[in-house]
C-alpha cells in the first residue's frame, strides 16, 4: 500500500532549513509536495518522520539556507526551481545508520548522502577532502556529521554517537 504524505508541520522539518525561521505548527505540506525530489507516496502503511535538509545547488551554505527558509515562509504555493531535499534520518527507528540510509534511498526513493568509513584515519582523510572542497561539488555544505553506525552502541552514548564537524 502506498501511503500519501498528508501533513508536514514546520516543527518536524526544523532541520530542513538549518535554522528555525518558520512558526512552529505551520502546515507546510503543500510547499513540500512541490519539491521535485521528495516522493509523493511511500510504500509502507505507517507513520514515518523523515528529517533532512532543503538546499539549492551552487550556492553558499548560508544563502542556500535563506532561500529554503524563504520558500517555506512564503504564503504562495509556487514551485521553487532548483530546491532539493536530502534525507538523513528516520526518527524513532532502531535501524543502524547504514541500513536506514539504504532504506530511505532504495525503498522510499529519497535522495541521501552516505559514506561508510570504518577507520579514524579514513574519517580524517574524508574531512580533509571536504575542507578542500573535493566533495559535494555544487552542493552547499557548512559541515559534515560523523555517526556511529550501530544502534545499540548509539544507545550507550546518547549525546556522543554523532559529531558535527564545521568549517
Question: Where on the chain are the PLM-derived regions?
Answer:
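RNA/tRNA-interacting regions in translation and RNA-turnover enzymes
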Residues: 1-167
Amino acid at each position: 500500500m502506498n501511503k500519501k504524505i498528508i501533513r508536514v508541520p514546520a516543527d518536524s522539518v526544523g532541520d530542513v532549513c538549518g535554522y528555525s525561521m518558520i512558526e512552529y505548527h505551520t502546515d507546510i505540506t503543500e510547499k513540500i509536495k512541490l519539491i521535485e525530489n521528495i516522493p509523493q507516496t511511500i510504500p509502507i502503511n505507517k507513520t514515518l518522520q523523515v528529517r533532512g535538509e532543503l538546499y539549492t545547488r551552487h550556492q553558499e551554505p548560508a544563502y542556500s539556507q535563506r532561500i529554503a527558509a524563504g520558500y517555506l515562509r512564503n504564503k504562495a504555493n509556487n514551485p521553487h526551481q532548483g530546491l532539493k531535499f536530502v534525507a538523513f534520518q528516520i526518527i524513532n527507528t532502531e535501524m543502524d545508520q547504514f541500513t536506514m540510509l539504504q532504506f530511505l534511498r532504495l525503498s522510499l526513493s529519497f535522495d541521501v548522502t552516505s559514506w561508510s568509513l570504518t577507520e579514524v584515519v579514513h574519517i580524517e582523510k574524508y574531512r580533509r577532502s571536504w575542507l578542500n572542497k573535493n566533495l559535494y561539488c555544487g552542493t552547499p555544505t557548512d559541515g559534515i556529521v560523523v555517526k556511529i553506525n550501530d544502534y545499540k552502541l548509539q544507545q550507550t552514548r546518547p549525546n556522543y554517537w554523532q559529531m558535527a564537524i564545521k568549517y
